[in-house]
UniProtKB/Swiss-Prot annotation:
It catalyses: L-glutamyl-tRNA(Gln) + L-glutamine + ATP + H2O = L-glutaminyl-tRNA(Gln) + L-glutamate + ADP + phosphate + H(+); L-aspartyl-tRNA(Asn) + L-glutamine + ATP + H2O = L-asparaginyl-tRNA(Asn) + L-glutamate + ADP + phosphate + 2 H(+). It is an enzyme of class 6 (ligase). Disulfide bonds: none annotated. It comes from Streptococcus equi subsp. zooepidemicus (strain H70). Heterotrimer of A, B and C subunits. This is Aspartyl/glutamyl-tRNA(Asn/Gln) amidotransferase subunit C.
Length: 100
């Protein structure tokens, strides 16, 4: 299955990534090869093979629900470059909402 350069540009825009023209071409080629390889799995005969959902034999491993003392706030804030109202201030990663 061929992944077009336009599809790469569209997904990049949704992801707020920017690629050069050569990178876009390279991604389209590489992604097309990956999809082709995955599509080969459709040709594997799995008749009689039991469905496998996980390889782990353990289920619902939980720790005891014990309250623990948190980190001292003064110690935590020693290396914080910016703080506001007792919170760590970080750069905004979301814009006004847009249509992305």
């Amino acid at each position: 299955m061929k992944i077009s350069e336009e599809e790469v540009r569209h997904v990049a825009a949704l992801s707020k990534l920017s690629f050069s023209e050569s990178e876009t071409i390279e991604f389209a080629t590489t992604l097309s090869k990956i999809v082709d390889m995955v599509e080969l799995l459709n040709e594997v005969d799995t008749t009689g093979v039991a469905i496998t959902t996980t390889m782990a034999d353990k289920k619902n491993i939980m720790r005891a629900d014990i309250a623990e003392t948190g980190v001292d706030r003064k110690f935590l804030f020693q290396n914080v470059p910016e703080k506001e109202n007792h919170f760590i201030k970080v750069p905004a990663i979301l814009d006004d909402g847009g249509d992305a």
